[in-house]
Amino acid sequence: MSPGLQKGSRLMENRSPPSSFSIEHILGLDKKTEVASSPIIKHHRPWIQCNSEGVDGTFWHIPVISCDLPVQVHALRRSMGEETQVRLEKCCGEEDRLTYKRELSWYRGRRPRTAFTRSQIEILENVFRVNSYPGIDIREELAGKLALDEDRIQIWFQNRRAKLKRSHRESQFLMVKDSLSSKIQE
C-alpha cells in the first residue's frame, strides 16, 4: 500500500464520530447502528389502547376519545344511525385525562361563538361610531360593564372594522357599476 493511502486509511480510522449537526445525524441516518445496541424506548401515549393485533405482532388501536363531551362522527352516524362516543376514563387516570384533554383542544375545534345581546351590541356600536380603534383601557371598561371578556370585545371591534371595510368596498363597486351602466345606455 502506498504511503498516501496508508495515511488516508489512518485518518479514516482516527476520524471522530459525526457531529450532531451533520446531515446524517439530522436525518437520523447515523442511528442505524445505534438502534440495534440501544434499548427500546417506549413513549407515553395514553390515547393508544392495545387491543387489536398489528402487522408486526404488536397490539395498536387508536380510539376516538372524548373526556367529557361526546365526539360525533358524522359519516359514521349517517351509516350507523347513532352517535359514537368513547370515554377516556376507561383507559387513563385523572392526571393523564386532564393532560390529554388539553392536548386535544385543537381537535374539538374553535371556542363556541359569543352570543351578544341586543343591548351589548347597541353599546358596542355607539362606542364604534365614536372610536373604531378603542384602546385596552376602553375595552377593559366595556368588558366590565357588559360582562364580557376583553378579548371578545377586541374581536368584536376587529370584525366590525372588517364589516365596515367590506361595505365601503361594495358601495364603491356599486357606484362604479352604476356609472358604467349609465354610460353604456347613453
From Swiss-Prot:
A GO CC term attached to the entry: nucleus
GO molecular function, one term: DNA-binding transcription factor activity, RNA polymerase II-specific
Keyword vocabulary terms for this entry: Developmental protein, DNA-binding, Homeobox, Nucleus
DNA-binding region(s) in UniProt: 109-168
Stored Gene3D superfamilies: Homeodomain-like
Superkingdom classification of source: Eukaryota
InterPro entries linked: HD, Hesx1, Homeobox_CS, Homeodomain-like_sf
GO BP of this protein: forebrain development; negative regulation of DNA-templated transcription; negative regulation of transcription by RNA polymerase II; regulation of neuron differentiation; Spemann organizer formation
Location of the protein in the cell: Nucleus
Principal location listed in the UniProt entry: nucleus
Subunit structure: Interacts (via N-terminus) with zyx.
Recorded family membership: Belongs to the ANF homeobox family.
Function of the molecule: Regulates the earliest stages of development of the anterior neural plate. Plays a role in forebrain development by inhibiting the expression of otx2 and pax6 in the rostral region of the anterior neural plate. Necessary for both neural differentiation and neural patterning. Controls Spemann organizer development. May act as a transcriptional repressor.
Full protein name: Homeobox expressed in ES cells 1
Species assigned in the record: Xenopus tropicalis (Western clawed frog)
